[in-house]
């Protein structure tokens, strides 16, 4: 196309008042489909709450889960729903409420980190279609998959300079590094929110650079309570020691007086 032809078309378009179609506004944010199991639901909330704790010093991020990500007009019109189980978007307005993640309302920003909580019925999609979408369209820097029912299932990829996913190598504990967040992602054995009722599960958790577990709000509260109880116990012991010392001093003074000595002169 010549410069002259392009200019003529621009003039014609301006003359007709043509404007590019506006993004759709009748977006659906809930398809009524719950997460696979209660364990999947708790696993998602654990990741969200852990991210909120780990990034508490920042305000320019959003952590969410099980919500739709809208990235194109065609996708929205086709009702081609894509909802990561967990994601974090950085360098965004973290004060806004979100029913979903609409990229054209977020200055074109996509999630920086995504975790899909797999099951036997979704593994092929999480490793195939979704992985390709997050790599080629979202350009999500760090992508992970994990089946809460399979402790050995954790895998992850990081986007290289060519915008292609490269598999992440696990450390000696089987954890994977998340460059975007500056955190480790690995399993933790225990009970969370009364799940399971007996025994333990292998939950996917965040760890800091020093490999310390990022605590959940209830774990922080429990730790603070334990510290408060320990401080109270120490204070009571100190009070008892002081009372015992005072009692010994009084007995000694009485004994000295009985011997005709003035305890104040000794």
Model-derived segments and their meaning:
Residues 141:
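Short acidic/polar active-site loop segments enriched in Thr and Asp
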């Amino acid at each position: 196309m010549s410069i002259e032809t392009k200019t003529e078309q621009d003039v014609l378009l301006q003359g007709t008042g043509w404007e590019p179609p506006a993004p759709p506004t009748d977006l659906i944010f809930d398809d009524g489909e719950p997460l696979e199991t209660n364990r999947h639901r708790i696993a998602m909330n654990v990741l969200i709450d852990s991210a909120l704790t780990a990034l508490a010093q920042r305000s320019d991020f959003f952590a969410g889960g099980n919500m739709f990500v809208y990235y194109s007009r065609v996708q929205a019109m086709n009702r081609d729903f894509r909802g990561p189980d967990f994601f974090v978007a950085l360098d965004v307005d973290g004060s806004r409420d979100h029913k979903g993640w609409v990229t054209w309302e977020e200055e074109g920003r996509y999630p920086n980190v995504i975790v899909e909580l797999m099951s036997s019925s979704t593994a092929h999609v999480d490793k195939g279609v979704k992985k390709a979408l997050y790599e080629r369209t979202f350009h999500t820097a760090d992508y992970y998959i994990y089946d809460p029912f399979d402790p050995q299932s954790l895998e992850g990829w990081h986007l290289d300079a060519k915008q292609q996913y490269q598999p992440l190598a696990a450390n000696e504990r089987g954890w994977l590094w998340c460059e975007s967040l500056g955190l480790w992602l690995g399993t933790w054995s225990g009970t969370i929110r009364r799940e399971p009722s007996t025994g333990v599960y292998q939950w996917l958790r965040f760890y800091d650079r020093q490999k310390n577990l990022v605590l959940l709000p209830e774990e922080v509260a429990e730790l603070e309570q334990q510290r408060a109880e320990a401080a109270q116990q120490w204070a009571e012991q100190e009070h008892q020691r002081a009372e015992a010392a005072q009692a010994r001093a009084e007995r000694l003074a009485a004994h000295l007086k009985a011997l005709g000595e003035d305890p104040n002169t000794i």
